């Protein structure tokens, strides 16, 4: 959780200026106090995410429903809004089940074109929405046959945009996913849409500088000269991924590490720390 309004806005890819005044009035600390005062104890995870101690979303739903019904609000579901009309400083909300008159409306549109058009008719200028929080479609020999392989911490760069994000990473059937990918897709949502989701990324699977990785490899080579490269546990990656790295580098996993050439070592380092891959599209996560 973050309790400083200005710092909090820095975590939002868009709308930080507009959110500052909102967070000055009501921020995560207020939200936590609101729930805990209504008998929903909360906990802060290591990554700063906040969850109910119960680990059940029903705890949150129950608290909010009880509060709304206690204040005599009505909750109407399965009702589709067909039109909103400005009427004498009020809003007439038209539905098939009847009309509602309101002085204030909060409309959570999502990306539904129909909803956006209704808001636009009320005089609001709409900015064309683009997808955010998506995964990358990639076809690369290094990822082939490895869906489900995860990395505790990796770094993804988009060199052409001079941007990077780090965090857990997951190989999927269609490419790459996980927090590192989702974060960079959120921050660069508009630019990636302009690129039609065709761009190059550079991945550091072990999230340490290539010079440090080189030192670790050379030290291991000196200390374990007779060990086969395929059985050498040097970095925090799975055995399957390590052997896939050797495969794309055309290195026999049975080869003694003492016999690994400088060229082969460099190929391993490039695959681990500076792997370039072409993104060819996006998918939902």
Question: Where in this protein do the model-derived segments appear?
Answer:
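Residue-level recognition of phosphate/Mg2+-coordinating polar/acidic sites
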Residues: 3-7, 13, 24, 30-48, ...
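Glycine-rich phosphate-binding loop signature in dinucleotide/nucleotide-binding domains
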Residues: 71-76, 98-101, 277
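A conserved short coil-to-beta-strand element within the FAD-binding core of flavoproteins
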Residues: 75-91
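Glycine-rich loop(s) and the adjacent beta-strand/alpha-helix scaffold that form part
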Residues: 104-144
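Short beta-strand to alpha-helix junction loop
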Residues: 20-27, 46-66, 108-110, 114, ...
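Short loop/edge segments at beta-strand edges and connector loops
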Residues: 75-79, 95, 128-130
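Short hydrophobic core segments
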Residues: 81, 93, 99-112, 118-120, ...
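N-terminal Rossmann-like dinucleotide/flavin-binding domain of flavoprotein oxidoreductases
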Residues: 8-14, 18-43, 54-74
């Amino acid at each position: 959780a973050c309790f400083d309004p200005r710092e909090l806005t820095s975590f939002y890819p868009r709308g930080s200026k507009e959110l500052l005044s909102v967070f000055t009035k009501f921020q995560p600390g207020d939200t936590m106090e609101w729930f805990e005062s209504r008998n929903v104890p909360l906990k802060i995870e290591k990554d700063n995410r906040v969850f109910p101690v119960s680990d059940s979303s029903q705890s949150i739903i129950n608290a909010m429903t009880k509060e709304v019904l206690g204040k005599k609000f009505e909750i109407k579901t399965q009702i589709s809004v067909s039109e909103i009309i400005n009427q004498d400083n009020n809003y007439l909300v038209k539905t098939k089940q009847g009309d509602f008159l309101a002085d204030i409306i909060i409309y959570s549109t999502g990306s539904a074109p129909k909803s956006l058009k209704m808001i636009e008719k009320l005089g609001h200028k709409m900015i064309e929405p683009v997808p955010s929080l998506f995964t990358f479609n990639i076809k690369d020999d290094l990822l082939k046959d490895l869906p489900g392989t995860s990395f505790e911490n990796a770094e993804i760069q988009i060199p052409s945009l001079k941007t990077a994000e780090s965090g857990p990473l997951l190989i999927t059937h269609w490419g790459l996913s996980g927090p590192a990918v989702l974060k960079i897709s959120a921050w660069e949502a508009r630019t990636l849409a302009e690129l039609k989701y065709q761009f190059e990324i550079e991945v550091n699977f072990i999230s340490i500088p290539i010079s440090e990785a080189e030192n670790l490899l050379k030290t291991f080579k000196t200390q374990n000269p007779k060990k086969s490269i395929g059985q050498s546990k040097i970095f925090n990656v799975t055995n399957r991924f390590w052997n896939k790295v050797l495969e794309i580098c055309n290195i026999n996993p049975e080869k003694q590490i003492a016999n690994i050439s400088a060229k082969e070592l460099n190929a391993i380092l490039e695959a681990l720390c500076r792997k370039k891959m072409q993104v060819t599209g996006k998918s939902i996560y």
